[in-house]
Amino acid sequence: MKLAFIIDPLEKLDPGHDSTVAIMEAAQKLGHEVFVTSVGDLAVINGQAWAKLAAVRLQPVILVDGHWQVSQPWSELSKSQWMALTECQAVFMRKDPPVTVQYLYATFILELLAPTKTMVINSPQGLREANEKMYTLQFAAVMPPTVVSLDKGLIRQFLEEHGAAVLKPLGGKAGEGILFLDPGDRNFNSLVEISTQHGKEPVMVQRFLPEAKEGDKRIILLDGDPIGAVNRIPSGAEFRGNMAVGGQVAPTTITSREIEICALLKPKLQADGLYFVGIDVIGGYLTEVNVTSPTGIREIDRLEGVRLGEKVICWLEKQF
């Protein structure tokens, strides 16, 4: 198969951490042609989706003493050329957040592809509809108490009722901009003003879960089914477990409660064409559903001795 990956600049990716590189490596190993492009290199020509694609050859990472060893150079790009995306059997939309106007237009271009001929992972419409914070609200039964608002009074009332909380920007990623807020914090007004861009944007406010100190679990779902998990433990006084802010990873198991959460999400994820998803769970509560470019494959592979990228490609092969 020919597989196209819409990514951030290749030189900015960390092959020892990046899930996209892991999936591309797996595709290459299993005999498929791998191409890369960017959201800025998509076009519509005579009603068809096209992309400026460059074939890529990867030097796979190697696990040595529990760490990924990366060869240099780890990738080799051919000269890019315009190609109709209908020539590809699948397109992986793996551009990191934030979701910009350019990103949204890219999803409209990708929607011109017939899913039965060229599968887009994840679905363009699904990506537009599934804001990673707001989408979670459809599963309120398994979430901690949550409010979304830009109103200081409502947010203060929430804190008085539920105690300490975390404030999350609706368009954030990798723990960026998440703040811890105590009911009696003298900086309350300032923190809310910062989070809401001075009353211009609503934020998500969730009850703080003390279990966060034991870890924020990332569970990878493929077509709605859990295929692996990793625990991300905050470092020092930090309350966020995200790897991007220094969280340490540890092996973990998927509990019966978490299997129930996955089963609850599965029908909706499948209906929305969200095939490759990473959910975050703290203390048995769903906190986020990550659909744009979920990470965690490299860490799970390293800790569990598996190859989740190959699972993704083997699943894809069965779709045709």
From Swiss-Prot:
PROSITE patterns: ATP_GRASP. Gene3D superfamilies: 3.40.50.20, ATP-grasp fold, A domain, ATP-grasp fold, B domain. Its EC number is 6.3.2.3. GO terms for cellular component: cytoplasm. Keywords: ATP-binding, Glutathione biosynthesis, Ligase, Magnesium, Manganese, Metal-binding, Nucleotide-binding. Residues 133-317 form the ATP-grasp domain. Mg(2+) binds at E288, N290. Its cofactor is Mg(2+); Mn(2+). It catalyses: gamma-L-glutamyl-L-cysteine + glycine + ATP = glutathione + ADP + phosphate + H(+). The keyword Transmembrane does not apply. Binds 1 Mg(2+) or Mn(2+) ion per subunit. Pathway: Sulfur metabolism; glutathione biosynthesis; glutathione from L-cysteine and L-glutamate: step 2/2. ATP binds at residues 159-215. SUPFAM superfamilies: Glutathione synthetase ATP-binding domain-like, PreATP-grasp domain. InterPro entries: ATP-grasp, ATP_grasp_subdomain_1, Glut_synth_pro, GSHS_ATP-bd, GSHS_N, PreATP-grasp_dom_sf. GO terms for molecular function: ATP binding; glutathione synthase activity; metal ion binding. Belongs to the prokaryotic GSH synthase family. HAMAP family: GSH_S (MF_00162). This is Glutathione synthetase. The lineage of its organism: Bacteria, Bacillati, Cyanobacteriota, Cyanophyceae, Synechococcales.
